[in-house]
Amino acid sequence: MSVKNNSFSSAEIPDVADQPRDRFNPEATQDLQEKDETKEEKEGDEEVKHDEAEEDQEVVKPNDAEEDDDGDDAEEDEEEEVEAEEDEEAEEEEEEEEEEEEEEEDSKERSPSSISGDQSEFMEIDLGEIRKDVQCPICLGIIKKTRTVMECLHRFCRECIDKSMRLGNNECPACRKHCASRRSLRDDPKFDALIAALFTNIDSYEEEELAFHEDEMARNKQIQASIAQISQRQSEALVKRRSLGKEAAVLMRSPRIASGSRRRRNSRNMEQQNASEAHEDDDNDDNNNRGRDKDSSSDERGTEVRQKKRRKRSTSRSTQHPSSSGANKNNGNCADNDTEVYRDTKGISPGLVWNPEILAWGRGGTRSNTRHGNNTSGGSSKSVRNARVNKLVEYLRSSVDGSSVELDIHVKLVSLDTKCIPDLPQPYLCCRPTLLVKQLREFVALQIHLKTEEVELLVTRRRVGEDAAIENLPAVTPASAAASKDEMLSLEDNETLSRLKIDFISSHEQHLIIAYRKKQTE
């Protein structure tokens, strides 16, 4: 008989941490005790059955034992086969479940476009929509021989991007991202293959794009016709406005026609009177000049007659034009006379704009400004001519006497040693008085193909009143250089031509003669 074992396994022992609240519950403790008792009874029954089975096996005969062993082996084999089949079925079910899960995941990952692509092998593509994606940003044409910028992945034609990089633009033309050199460019044959598949003939496609279609031609004709109609309407409206403006101007000017005709008649009468008086003065002057040698008394009579006529004219003009009385006092100063006349005539006719630069008709038909000087006083042509001559003389005197006027100096350049240095093809020059000798030396050096430091400019040394022709001087050689120093004077760089003209040119000479030679080393 086996000893009854009342021990418990670790799984059967209740954990105090799992049941903290049942420790102080009496009902929970009773339940545990009942469970333990039932377990002990079951274990005891099993042990009893086991002991009985062992006793039966000992009593059974050997033959029976062998038969029982064969039956047990067959049963075990059948059980093993059933278990193997069940395992295989379970594995197959697991594999099927895994495949279904994978298919579900693949279906989730797939997009609608891929599903449609699986359904149909080919897609319809509109080339107009893809045109922008295959366009070169530089030439705006379809990309040929694609090159991709590695920094930004923008694509260009090979010729376009190479030309841009040669010009020194080390940046992407599309996004202005810096590119170090052409090494950052890569060919893209796959993109070229895609373009070749989409556009079989790129040149013909671009020609079709550039060509005008019939609809566009009709639309352009309509636009041109509408523009022509609008321009015609505008021109007609402008013509109408001009005609209306002219009619209004004629209506406004009609009251002034009578006054204008009177002024014209008065002006004509005054011009005729002035011309006749001037003619009489000229005749009297000629007669007086002819008889001056014969009789001195005729001069006195002529002067008296002229004075009387001038007094008559001045009195008549003062009565007709009181504003011009002050202007007759001085015929030489035309600007003062003009200003005085305009100041006086402002009160007479305030409707006119009295600007000395604007020609206007004054009272009695006389002009406020004439072509040559002031003629408002009706002076003779001889007095006007004398005033003009006086003005010209004064201007010439001021220009000659003034220090600001500088005349050009005529210079002649001559070579002292014609064997070494030839004469210039154009030796005569016209220079400014402020020109320096240094600048002239640079010019000579440039003409004879020498350095500026190797050229020396000389001028004849002479006393006042003496003239020396430098053209007649003998050729200077290194042996005679010391002797020529006494006759010639070397010029400094800071000297001006005006100073040389005063010191080295005589009154009857027309040119300042300057010689040049190669500077001699001592």
Swiss-Prot record:
Knocked-out gene: effects: Normal phenotype. Drastic growth defects like ectopic meristem formation and sterility when associated with the disruption of RING1B.
Gene Ontology CC: one annotated term: PRC1 complex
Residue stretches of biased makeup (Polar residues): 1-10, 326-336, 366-384
Gene name tied to this protein: RING1A
Free-text note regarding domains: The RING-type zinc finger domain mediates binding to an E2 ubiquitin-conjugating enzyme.
UniProt subcellular location: Nucleus
The entry's keywords: Chromatin regulator, Metal-binding, Nucleus, Repressor, Transcription, Transcription regulation, Transferase, Ubl conjugation pathway, Zinc, Zinc-finger
Domain of life: Eukaryota
Pathway listed: Protein modification; protein ubiquitination
Natural source organism: Arabidopsis thaliana (Mouse-ear cress)
Subunit structure as annotated in this protein's UniProt entry: Homodimer or heterodimer with RING1B. Interacts with CLF. Component of the PRC1-like complex, at least composed of RING1A, RING1B and LHP1.
Enzyme superclass (EC): transferase
Role summary: Putative E3 ubiquitin-protein ligase that mediates monoubiquitination of 'Lys-119' of histone H2A (H2AK119ub), thereby playing a central role in histone code and gene regulation.
Biased composition (Basic and acidic residues): 32-64, 287-306
GO process terms (BP): cell fate determination; maintenance of floral meristem identity; maintenance of inflorescence meristem identity; maintenance of shoot apical meristem identity; negative regulation of DNA-templated transcription; negative regulation of gene expression, epigenetic; protein ubiquitination
Swiss-Prot/TrEMBL catalytic activity: S-ubiquitinyl-[E2 ubiquitin-conjugating enzyme]-L-cysteine + [acceptor protein]-L-lysine = [E2 ubiquitin-conjugating enzyme]-L-cysteine + N(6)-ubiquitinyl-[acceptor protein]-L-lysine
Acidic residues bias locations: 65-106
Region (Disordered): 1-119, 250-347, 363-385
Protein name per UniProt: Putative E3 ubiquitin-protein ligase RING1a
Zn-finger (RING-type) residues: 136-176
Biased composition (Low complexity): 316-325
Pfam families in alphabetical order: zf-C3HC4_2
GO-annotated molecular function: transferase activity; zinc ion binding
PANTHER family assigned to the protein according to its UniProt record, in alphabetical order: E3 UBIQUITIN-PROTEIN LIGASE RING1A-RELATED, OS11G0578200 PROTEIN
EC number, UniProt record: 2.3.2.27
